Regions:
Chain B
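Short, non-helical or kinked segments that cap or interrupt transmembrane helices
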Residues: 29-51, 91-104, 180, 224-239, ...
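Helix-loop-helix "hairpin" substructures at the membrane interface of multi-pass membrane proteins
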Residues: 149-228, 251-252, 256
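Cytosolic-side transmembrane-helix boundaries in multi-pass membrane proteins
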Residues: 186-193, 197-200, 271-321
Length: 348, 321
């Protein structure tokens, strides 16, 4: 088997294993896994409404996945997508509500503001990593909690003590009557196009520009990049900033498309953490991220159908997602297994 | 409230908040000293909190007043078993330990919530009858000023937590096991050459961390919330991780950091009721973010990179240099 095939097989085997273990869990908990997975399937593809909602769910997942993947390519692990997403969400809603401008200016400015807010939240761990060698994983985790509390406090402030911000102006909204009608009045919005555009941006940036080459080089080997005359510090900071900008846009999807406002959050949205799964499954490539986001976005939305249709708690899907991450992370053992299988075949 | 009364309130509450963090952070010390990064502390704590509550609810008729204590043991056991997953992934399967830890976190909360919905048919459990009791420590409680601060109506678990820090210090620095643990975390190849089984030590360390985090979670749920739901632990595990780093991977340091974080959390929840002018004027959000901001500052300022165990996060592959 060539390396390429193995690289493709590892995520596929992980998904199968994850679903399999999920079925075993359902079986042992006294649920019927077959009707569970049928309910999941119908929750994703059942009718045009479900498909619309599923695609809507996929858009922030693509952006969160891009954020994690982009940082990974420069050797950085951005667990802070969750926090960057929240500040992006709040900023989008705030800018979207506070100004009255024609749509052609308002919407881009709002999206830009969300990206900037996320970028700012990524800048802090980036600078700390580049200048003081502080581990970005810890800083981004801490920044998540700072974001959670700060955003909640800001919502209270701007809404005058309430738990919810104002609705955004229609000129900043990503809502689309056309897409909504097409999918039986789902909340599908134009965000999916923004997300796909960003996939193209990431691909172009990484594969076709000098900056992208440097970012990847730093990810492969910092010392070699330094020796070749690249500015490693600048690239680390830049990578975190761009990663944060993607995450901020993911927040804008929720703010400008799905909800149109923001309520105080009791905990994290989970999209940022699932972004880690998306990136891992997609092997940190732009196209892979689309694939990973489609899978996890579908699973997450389809799960909502499971309590009603099959009477199974929807957390089963979170178990499956976590297991898939676990298996992808343990890819080494899958590779070993595949090699052994291969040798046996050759021996015959 | 006079200033002294404020202290009588804040100090015991801080220690109560710190106890789960101390247990979990010291669990983290064991794991990371052996060279296995354990971001999964949060998930392990969730597991402990969940098992503690469910066991307490199920067996309260059998064990009566002893229920919360036996629940702690049950939580320890289950979380320790759960942590084996992390050990297998990061030691035997050479997985990225941070990613595996993230999976443990997601899995912990998912399994706990799935089971809660299965058992109770709703998003959170019932409230437990027998919480961990508060006790007055005889004689010591009569000391003026200090008595009411430290020895009146304290949780038994808080005393245990502080004792654990010293036990952990003894184990890590004064026993052969501790020496092996640290050597495996600093230079696994050297340790291997001396005949120490790297994977055995690492497995043991991760399982200890799982057990301690489980106790930590069960203490939190059985003292603070009294039930289990999706927001019960909400970041305590990450806070413990921060305490471990803030405490420079040292049990006594972790103890100090955890006590400090307990204090910050107490301020956050009680700032509005404390009748001191300058505290009232500070918005609560600053207290909420204080532990996290301090951790970032501590990492940036006081703690150099050198303090982390050298081989932390690297799988040991025999024969490779």
């Amino acid at each position: 088997m060539s390396n390429r095939v193995v690289n493709l097989l590892v995520p596929i085997i992980s998904i199968i294993l994850g679903l399999l273990v999920g079925a075993i869990v359902m079986l042992f908990s006294g649920y019927d896994p077959v009707s569970g997975y049928i309910a999941l399937w119908n929750g994703i593809f059942g009718d045009s409404y479900a498909i619309g909602e599923t695609i809507r769910q996929i858009s922030p997942y693509i952006l969160a996945g891009l954020a994690v993947a982009f940082a990974f390519r420069s050797g950085l692990f951005n667990i802070g997508v969750e926090g960057q997403l929240m500040v992006g969400w709040f900023t989008a809603v705030y800018v979207g509500a506070a100004f009255e401008l024609p749509m052609i200016i308002h919407l881009p400015i709002t999206l830009l503001a969300a990206a900037l807010a996320g970028a700012l939240w990524g800048l802090v761990p980036g600078i700390l990593k580049a200048t003081l060698k502080v581990h970005e994983v810890i800083v981004t985790i801490m920044m998540n909690y700072v974001a959670l509390h700060v955003v909640n406090a800001l919502i209270k402030t701007v809404s005058g003590g309430s738990y919810k911000t104002d609705k955004i102006q229609p000129t900043a909204s990503l809502r689309s009557d056309f897409l909504s009608n097409l999918t039986d009045y789902s909340t599908l919005h134009y965000g999916i196009f923004v997300a796909l555009a960003m996939v193209a941006v990431m691909w172009f940036l990484l594969e076709k520009t000098k900056t992208g080459f440097e970012l990847k080089a730093v990810g492969f080997n910092e010392n070699a990049s330094q020796y070749a005359g690249m500015n490693v510090k600048k690239n680390i900071i830049l990578s975190m900033v761009i990663s944060g900008a993607f995450a901020g846009l993911a927040g804008a999807m929720e703010g400008l498309g799905t909800f149109g406002s923001m309520t105080t959050q009791g905990g994290f949205t989970g999209i940022g953490f699932d972004g880690i799964a998306v990136a891992l499954l997609g092997a940190n490539t732009p196209l892979g991220v689309i694939f990973g986001a489609s899978l996890f976005g579908s699973l997450k939305y389809g799960a909502n159908n499971m309590p009603n249709a099959a009477n199974i708690p929807l957390e089963i899907v979170s178990i499956v997602v976590a297991l898939i991450i676990f298996f992808v992370a343990s890819g080494y053992i899958i590779r070993v297994g595949l090699q052994r299988l291969n040798k046996k075949k050759e021996a015959k | 409230m006079s200033f002294l009364e404020v202290l009588y309130f804040i100090i015991p509450t801080s220690i109560a908040y710190a106890a789960p963090l101390i247990f979990t952070a010291i669990g983290g010390v064991f794991s990371e000293r052996s060279g296995v990064v354990n971001i999964g502390l949060e998930g392990l704590m969730v597991m402990g909190a969940f098992v503690g509550i469910v066991f307490n609810l199920a067996f309260v008729d059998v064990f009566g007043g002893w229920t919360p204590w036996i629940s702690l043991l049950a939580a320890m056991l289950v979380a320790a078993i759960f942590s084996i997953m992390h050990a297998v992934a990061s030691v035997s399967f050479r997985a990225d330990q941070v990613v595996s830890g993230v999976a443990i976190n997601m899995l912990g909360i998912a399994i706990a919530l799935f089971s809660v919905k299965m058992m109770f048919g709703k998003g959170q459990t019932d409230f437990i009858q027998e919480k961990i009791p508060r006790v007055n420590i005889p004689i010591l409680q009569d000391i003026p000023v200090l008595g009411p601060m430290f020895f009146k109506s304290v949780y038994g678990t808080s005393v245990l937590a502080i004792a654990l820090a010293f036990v952990a210090w003894f184990v890590i620095y004064k026993t052969p096991f501790g020496l092996r643990l640290r050597s495996v975390g600093e230079h696994p190849m050297a340790a291997d050459t001396m005949g120490i089984s790297v994977s055995k030590i690492r497995y043991t360390a991760v399982i200890i961390s799982g057990g301690l985090a489980g106790i930590g979670g069960a203490i939190y749920s059985q003292t603070m919330t009294g039930d289990f739901g999706h927001a019960t632990i909400n970041g305590q595990g990450f806070m413990a991780l921060a305490a471990m780093i803030f405490g420079k991977w040292h049990p006594i340091g972790a103890l100090g950091a955890a006590l400090f974080f307990g204090f910050a959390q107490t301020l956050a929840i009680s700032a509005s009721s404390i009748d001191i002018d300058f505290i009232q004027k500070i918005p609560a959000v600053y207290f909420h973010i204080l532990p996290y901001v301090l951790t970032i500052l501590a990492l940036a300022g006081f703690i150099g990179k050198a303090n982390a165990p050298k081989a932390n996060g690297e799988p040991y592959i025999k024969g490779s240099r």
